[in-house]
C-alpha cells in the first residue's frame, strides 16, 4: 500500500530539461568543451549540477577543482534565474496532479536541482503549501543514480509517518538515473514519458509508465499499487 508520494522535479513537473541542457552547454562552450544533446541525455542528465560539470570536465581531460565547479554552478544558476523570470513552462496537469495526490498522501520533492529553483517553481505553480518536504542538490553529496536523495526524502517523510517503509513510497520520475536511484532506495517508481521513451523507462525498472501526469490520480495509485 502506498503511503507517500515523491516527485522528481525537472522533467516531471517543470518542462525545463532542454533549458538545463542549453545552459550546461553554454557554460561548457565558454571553456572550449563541446557537448551535444545525445551525450547529455546519455551521460549527464541524471546528475545534479556539481556532478554534471565535474564529470564533463573530467571526460574532456580537464581538472575539476571544487571551487572552479562552484563558479560554473553559479554561472548556470544565474542564467537559469533569468530564464525562469521570463517564464517557466510546466507540464500539463502538473499543479492538479500534485495537489490531488496531496489530498490523500504526504508529497515530497527529491531533485538534483537547486533549492531556490524548486521553491520558485512551486510558488509559481501555487502548490508550495502542498509539499511536505524538499530534498535538493544542497542536501546530498551523491547525485542520482545513487539513492542518497531518496533516502533523505524518506527520512524527512518519517517526521510525520515514523513507520513509513521505502516500498510504501511511490516515486514519479522521468529519467533513467532517477528510476535507478528510486529502486535502489527500495521505492516503487513510475516513469513519465516526458524525456525518455516508454520502452526505455520499462527497461530501467519502472513499475508503471504513463504518458502524462494527468494519469496519476489518487484512485489510480490505490488501484495500481
Language model features with spans:
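Generic serine detector
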Residues: 30, 54, 93, 111, ...
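Short coil/turn residues that cap or connect secondary-structure elements
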Residues: 32, 48, 61-64, 109, ...
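Residue-level detector of anion-binding/catalytic polar loops
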Residues: 34, 106-107, 188, 207
